[in-house]
Swiss-Prot record:
Compositional bias (Basic and acidic residues): 370-380, 388-402, 428-438
Segments of this protein annotated with the region Disordered: 117-188, 362-453, 496-515
Compositionally biased tracts (Acidic residues): 502-515
Name of the protein: Uncharacterized protein ORF53
């Protein structure tokens, strides 16, 4: 059950990222990056659904399923509830192409009903048009007479269909994709280079049409090629030297100072997903979201978390346009009880409006600290010397006189030490007697140990050796690994006579045993 819940959360996270990406790039002209990322996210959703996340009827009623339903209706370019197709453009055609490609190859557990705009569980894995043809062939083959006739016909006309079959797939591949040239598949590097050339030339429609090539490529490779470009803003696509490079679970963004305000406003779409019943799990400030999950419950949650992440880490140079927007957020963060004081100290540095003011604030803070220290020192000196302030010259003499008396107490201390050294013999005896009395209390603990040791049964070592290896007598002449039942023998072994007997009688036998 835990695995299914984690997979559901992963689906929800992917859907929220797609929603954010859509809302952030409404006004962008180049849609190629958007389409590529949506294709990758769609593939991950499909793989997770195929692995068994949506395998019961109850799973089709959750928020992840509803968002997946809306996403598929958008991908199939149909208006919700009407079944009418939208006007075609490059974006919808590309999305439709991706969805059809995925639906034909990997979409096995969910299908789309275009008329009702519903996603229903399907027991059929392949397209319904292909299945009846295969069934007819299977029913026609078992007969003995029928297969012979078509085989002869195919032999007579075998050259033409074979050539057609060889030519048709090559033509389809050349029309729909660039994955093969002259019947040979391209490598991933060649595919990436080809689509990158299409985007640089401005043929976005062709690049979008080839986006299914990227379905087997990791998102990190896409980041390097398309999303993160050196010295260019990911939003306005203008060159700029000073950029803020921020990474996320989905994408990495270079933000210029002019666009950061608009970028933050677009990130409010993150809350749209929350209002639709989706709980945000990951964002590109993952550590702050996990550490402070219950900070905010209003619409500015992600906005404040974003600024909190940047302020605490100190990885942002604040532009002039966002000072007014940032001030209430900083005030709110400082008033929050769940934020650590160390983090609040870092946030307080951003309260001044300019860098000069920050320097002044830091310098004034140091000056204030020095003044406070000097004032405290003056107060201490005043409290120490209020009485001698009446006379000017004598206090110095009195101080000198006062410095002499500390010297005589030193011999006094020595005399006391000598007295103590002379009289250590008698008093410590009483102290030792007092200390010895509680030490007697340790005897019951020894008794307890003896009692606990008495519970152990004797170990029969004879079971651990073979008969040939068993020594019969030890150094003292007593048997090893054997305890006699007679009390007399036990007493002899335990008593002092056993040693004498061993010296006189049994030592010869003992030495013969080893010889």
């Amino acid at each position: 059950m835990a695995d299914k819940e984690t997979m559901k959360n992963a689906i929800v996270a992917d859907l929220t990222r797609i929603v954010i990406w859509k809302n952030m790039h409404k006004n962008s002209t180049d849609q190629s990056e958007k389409i590529l990322l949506q294709a990758i996210n769609l593939k991950s959703i499909l793989h997770r659904s195929i692995t068994g996340v949506l395998d019961s009827k109850n799973d089709y009623e959750g928020p992840a399923f509803l968002e997946l339903k809306k996403l598929m209706s958008y991908l199939f370019a149909e208006k919700p509830g009407t079944g009418e197709k939208k006007e075609k453009d490059a974006e919808t055609d590309a999305l439709l192409h991706i969805a059809q490609y995925l639906r034909g190859s990997e979409w096995k557990k969910l299908t789309v009903d275009p008329a009702n705009d519903n996603i229903l569980p399907s027991q059929v894995k392949e397209n319904p048009k292909k299945q009846p043809a295969k069934r007819k062939r299977s029913t026609s083959r078992p007969a003995n007479e029928k297969p012979s006739a078509p085989e002869n016909k195919q032999q007579e006309k075998g050259d033409i269909p074979d050539e057609d079959k060889q030519e048709q797939p090559v033509k389809k591949i050349r029309k729909n994709s660039t994955s093969a040239v002259d019947g040979k598949r391209k490598s991933q590097a060649e595919r990436l280079a080809h689509i990158k050339e299409l985007i640089e030339e401005g043929d976005n429609s062709k690049a979008i049409a080839q986006s299914h090539v990227y379905l087997g490529i990791k998102p990190d490779e896409l980041k390097k090629l398309f999303l993160v470009k050196a010295n260019t803003c990911s939003i306005c696509h203008k060159p700029s030297k000073k950029l803020l490079n921020k990474g996320c679970c989905l994408f990495s963004v270079n933000i210029c100072k002019k666009c950061i305000g608009d970028y933050m406003e677009n990130l409010h779409s993150y809350m749209v997903a929350k209002k639709m019943g989706i709980k945000p799990i990951h964002c590109w400030a993952c550590s702050t979201v996990q550490k402070y999950e219950d900070f905010i419950e209003d619409d500015n949650m992600f906005y404040k978390r974003f600024w909190y992440f940047l302020l605490v880490n100190g990885k942002i140079a604040l532009p002039q346009t966002n000072k007014d927007k940032l001030r209430p957020v900083v005030d709110w963060l400082l008033a929050c009880d769940k934020i650590d004081e160390e983090d609040k100290d870092k946030i307080r540095l951003y309260l001044p409006k300019s860098a000069a003011a920050r320097k002044k604030a830091r310098s004034t803070s140091t000056v204030i600290e020095k003044n406070v220290e000097s004032e405290t020192k003056q107060e201490e000196t005043e409290t120490i010397t209020p009485k001698p302030a009446e006379d000017e010259t004598p206090p110095m003499k009195e101080e000198v006189i006062e410095m002499k008396p500390p010297t005589p107490p030193e011999p006094v201390i020595k005399e006391e030490e000598e007295k103590v050294s002379e009289e250590p013999e008698i008093p410590p005896i009483k102290e030792i007697e007092d200390k010895v009395e509680p030490m007697v209390e340790d005897t019951p603990e020894e008794d307890k140990v003896a009692e606990s040791m008495a519970d152990f049964e004797p170990i029969d070592f004879s079971t651990m050796l073979d008969e040939d290896e068993k020594p019969q007598v030890n150094y003292y002449g007593s048997p090893i690994g054997h305890v006699s039942d007679d009390d007399d023998e036990i007493k002899e072994v335990a008593g002092g006579n056993a040693v004498q007997e061993a010296d006189t009688e049994s030592m010869d036998d003992f030495m013969d045993y080893f010889n």
